[in-house]
Amino acid sequence: MSLSFQKYQGLGNDFLLIDNRHQEELLLTPEQAQFWCDRHFGVGADGVIFLLRGTGESDYRMRMYNADGSVAQMCGNGIRCLAKFIFALEGRSAGEIVRYRIDTLAGLIVPEVQADGQVTVDMGKPRLLAQQIPTTLAAADQKVVDVPLTVGDRQWLVTCVSMGNPHCVTFVEDVAALDLAVLGPQFEHHPAFPQRTNTEFVQVLGSDRLRMRVWERGAGMTLACGTGACATLVAAVLTGCLSPGGDQAQATVELPGGDLQIRWDLPSQHLYMTGPALAVFSGTLP
């Protein structure tokens, strides 16, 4: 039986989007998702995202496999792509502003398609306690801020944030000088992270600008990571690398695939991410 899909990308972070609303069982197995994400033998993508019918307070549900077939709790670039996928499925017109309540394995996430086609996402609150990441780098009820971690042949100062998925953020002088193909797997599989981790290597460019490279858990080196950009802004504030302006902290996060605008509303603790999501092509899996 053939299966239709749409390919979308958000800053080069690309996904296969599948309309799964007519049944509860996901239309691809983890092994099939891994095969179709392969850029040599399959279609090529950083993950597969399934759209399911909503339940309770949600309009829709999102479920996702990473490129290695593992389950992803959430994906910032992915949920922007999903919002544009829904926008098209509903037959919306360009210029409409539409908000969706989407149930994810990280909780309820609310993306809003803007009049200019960009998508702003209420990413919710960061989780900062070691047990919430999870990590063994601090006591369960303590934050992990500028904690030393030995990876490879050097010690790194890391700050850990969960955006529904685990992130390990480290600030460096020059992100371009790092060999992520070597460092990324060493961080991802470090025993301090029992569920593995995403890792962000960040260079501070100015009072409101950060440059970030990312190694994603289950996907490897990617061109962008929305939850990682959010975690990076939080880590920059917690470590004093950036100072909030009043009750807001915000920054442009430069990624290899382009820029994301990230804002942290300190009174509510909610993070907001704004960026593009574009359809690439449609196809059919045999």
From Swiss-Prot:
Site (Could be important to modulate the pK values of the two catalytic cysteine residues): 167, 216
Keyword line: Amino-acid biosynthesis, Cytoplasm, Isomerase, Lysine biosynthesis
Pathway: Amino-acid biosynthesis; L-lysine biosynthesis via DAP pathway; DL-2,6-diaminopimelate from LL-2,6-diaminopimelate: step 1/1
MF terms in GO: diaminopimelate epimerase activity
Matches recorded under Pfam families: DAP_epimerase
Catalytic activity: (2S,6S)-2,6-diaminopimelate = meso-2,6-diaminopimelate
Gene3D superfamilies, A to Z: Diaminopimelate Epimerase, Chain A, domain 1
GO CC, alphabetical: cytosol
Example GO BP: lysine biosynthetic process via diaminopimelate
Alphabetical list of SUPFAM superfamilies matching this protein: Diaminopimelate epimerase-like
Chief place where the protein resides: cytoplasm
Location relative to the cell: Cytoplasm
Active site (record annotation): 75, 225
InterPro entries linked: DAP_epimerase_AS, DAP_epimerase_DapF
EC number assigned by the record: 5.1.1.7
Principal EC category: isomerase
Coiled-coil zones: none
Positions that bind substrate: 13, 66, 76-77, 165, 198, 216-217, 226-227
Family, similarity comment: Belongs to the diaminopimelate epimerase family.
Protein role: Catalyzes the stereoinversion of LL-2,6-diaminopimelate (L,L-DAP) to meso-diaminopimelate (meso-DAP), a precursor of L-lysine and an essential component of the bacterial peptidoglycan.
Subunit and partners: Homodimer.
Identification of the protein by name: Diaminopimelate epimerase
Organism: Thermosynechococcus vestitus (strain NIES-2133 / IAM M-273 / BP-1)
